[in-house]
């Protein structure tokens, strides 16, 4: 949690010719964004976790957030065992994490399986962080085009009888589904972490910025496109692109 700053509002009244002073103590959270290294953001490692591990040793963050595309040949917790006791590890998934059953299992069945930020808001080091895993697929939904399927239930209903979500092809599991995306607009967060980019990038999607605005998000961090940059989109939302195997702080400063 952020540190607490205390200050007082003083009201003075007169009672029986005497001054009566009321002090009301007010607390507010210290601005977590003023401590940029409290959370680090790791761009697509593609099997190379050395820069992230080095950054944790150097900057001692409270938490790290990984932005997808791990290309895991062993469980994620094994790859990061050197920093397991040094910081919190959180993550979203990228398209590469659904390429094979092994890559998928090494992420979703790892000891960090409960640190998946997808489709929920989690308080991390005093900030509300919401995650959006996966990518837009033409066979599911590719904005600004209309979605091919309203949601997973719609897709599954079109398949053979008794086909369950667990049987969905990995390619479809990697997709951003329209109904899940829209449901996020009911949540509130400070930071959005996504694999896909918003409209700040030439290969980004305007709808991600619209989603961020609906949630009250002030900063977006994304991976996928292997570029470090800082930009501003509509509604004064800051966007920080984090390159492959790069690490950035809360201000978007490249640390590795």
Regions found by a protein language model. Give the residues of each.
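N-terminal active-site segment of His-dependent metallophosphoesterases
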Residues: 7, 14-85, 99, 186-188
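Binuclear metal-dependent phosphoesterase catalytic core
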Residues: 35-36, 51-54, 122-125, 210-215, ...
């Amino acid at each position: 949690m952020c540190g607490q700053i205390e200050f007082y509002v003083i009201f003075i009244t007169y009672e029986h010719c005497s001054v009566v002073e009321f002090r009301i103590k007010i607390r507010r959270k210290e601005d977590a964004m003023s401590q940029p290294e409290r959370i680090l953001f790791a761009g697509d490692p593609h099997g190379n976790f050395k820069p992230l591990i080095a950054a944790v040793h150097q900057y001692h963050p409270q938490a790290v957030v990984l932005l997808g595309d791990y290309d895991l040949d062993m469980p994620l917790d094994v790859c990061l065992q050197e920093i397991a006791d040094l910081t919190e590890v959180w993550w979203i998934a990228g398209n590469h994490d659904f390429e094979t059953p092994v890559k998928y299992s090494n992420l979703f069945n790892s000891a960090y399986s409960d640190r998946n930020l997808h489709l929920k808001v989690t308080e991390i080091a005093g900030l509300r962080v919401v995650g959006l895993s996966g990518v837009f697929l033409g066979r599911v939904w590719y904005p600004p085009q209309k979605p091919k399927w309203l949601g997973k239930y719609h897709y599954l209903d079109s398949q053979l009888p008794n086909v369950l979500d667990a049987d969905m092809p990995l390619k479809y599991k990697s997709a951003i589904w329209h109904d899940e995306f829209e449901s996020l607009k009911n949540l509130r967060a400070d930071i959005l972490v996504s694999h896909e980019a918003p409209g700040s990038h030439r290969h980004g999607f305007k709808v991600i910025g619209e989603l961020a605005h609906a949630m009250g998000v002030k900063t977006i961090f994304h991976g996928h496109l292997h570029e470090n940059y800082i930009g501003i989109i509509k509604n004064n939302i800051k966007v920080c692109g984090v390159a492959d195997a790069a690490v950035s702080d809360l201000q978007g400063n490249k640390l590795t």
